[in-house]
């Protein structure tokens, strides 16, 4: 069995220092929370992702994937009836797929409960269909990598 750690455990620590400490502690992999790398993860570039991959590999670590995908910006949402908000969330998800692939990751964990919770006035089946539509767009992008 291999062990990995989430990088947000090391908030306020440089990525390189986090990798060094995780490797020294015996971890073999890390999961990345995009909001820990940039206040607005939409600003992250493929070059940033490749740099993270290189730093992790330099410490003998594998980047397994991304998690806490929709934490920042906080207005992203996959079940909302607001089509513009959902479209921007899916666009961001596709961006994260490309970053994850550039980091060598293969897993994207769709946590971020505030980005999928339902308001009482929303119909569950409709919200589920909206979420499936948004995630489908992201999955299509993931299939390219």
Annotated model-derived regions:
Residues 1, 19, 41-43, 79-84:
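Gly/Pro-rich active-site loop or hairpin
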Residues 1-13:
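Boundary/entry segment of secreted carbohydrate-active catalytic domains
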Residues 17, 54-62, 75-145:
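Active-site acidic/histidine proton-transfer and metal-coordination neighborhood
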Residues 31, 65-67, 109:
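Conserved beta-strand positions in the central sheet of alpha/beta enzyme cores
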Residues 33-57, 112-119:
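Glycine-rich, proline-tolerant flexible connector loops at the mouths of alpha/beta enzymes
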């Amino acid at each position: 069995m291999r062990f990995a750690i989430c990088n947000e455990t090391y908030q306020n620590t440089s990525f390189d220092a986090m990798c060094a400490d995780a490797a020294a502690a015996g971890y073999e992999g890390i999961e990345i929370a995009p909001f820990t790398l940039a206040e607005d993860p939409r600003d992250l570039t493929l070059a940033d992702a490749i740099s993270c991959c290189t730093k992790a590999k330099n410490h003998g670590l594998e980047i397994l994937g991304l998690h806490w995908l929709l934490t920042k910006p906080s207005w992203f949402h996959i079940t909302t009836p607001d089509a513009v908000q959902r479209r921007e969330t899916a666009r961001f998800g596709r961006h994260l797929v490309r970053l994850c692939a550039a980091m060598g990751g293969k897993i994207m964990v769709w946590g971020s409960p505030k980005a999928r919770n339902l308001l009482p006035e929303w119909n569950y089946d409709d919200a589920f269909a909206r979420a499936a539509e948004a995630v489908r767009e992201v999955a299509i992008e993931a299939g390219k990598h």
